[in-house]
Amino acid sequence: KYFSVGASANYNFGKFNYEKFNLMNGVNYGVFSNSSSEITGFTYNFSSNVLIPLKNNLSLSILFSLYPEGELDSYNIESLYTSNASSISLESLGDFVDIDLDARGLENTKLPVPKKSIYSIGLEKKNSWFIGAQYENKLSSGFENVFLDIRNVSYRDANSISFGGYFIPDSSSLVSYWKRIKYRFGIKNDKKSIIVNNLPINQFSLNLGLGLPIAGLSKANLGLEIGKIGNDDLIKENYFSLRLGLSLNDVWFIKRKYN
């Protein structure tokens, strides 16, 4: 009743492209390289959750998720082009040659998937408030892409810490709409796995949100994320994003028998 376990399998597919252009002063033609990888394969996730009832309608939840180390299949292609301009376009590309990756053992490779663990804990008073924290760790320091070996890029173990929750002033209020709104908040500090030019990349974000009651038990969810990523010695980006979502109760999809 208070303990549950679960597992899931995910099929991953997609394509990565890496483009590079070399142009030297005094040389009319530059060299443009295009490397691409088509990724396919399964990843797995195992989770366990403990829900502990407490006094005063409180409950404590503890969650652990494990993403085991794995591998994805990578089919790789690399082509070299000559170009007679300082900017790349279809018109500027000249002769090209496809690299024989099979002879180098790089046409079909394995892309490692690092092991990831997630630990979460939260305290909730149902339909009133929630406060929680989450720690995520990814063992990515040994990650290596043998096909796309970028010289100025290395990897480290990644981790992130986040805190957040929600508050509903009075979920059963019949007088004030604003008291039935779910007010969400959260902060996250993320240490990325990638290192560029020996400089680590970190991300910090602040999240605010509103759960707006609409017909029945459905809600319209509004979210705002404000954050920064990178560092002053490399590339630093300040950003914000807006999100809108709908959570529809199944009563919307039940055909009425009487009008």
Predicted regions and their residues:
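Outer-membrane beta-barrel porins/channels
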Residues: K1-N259
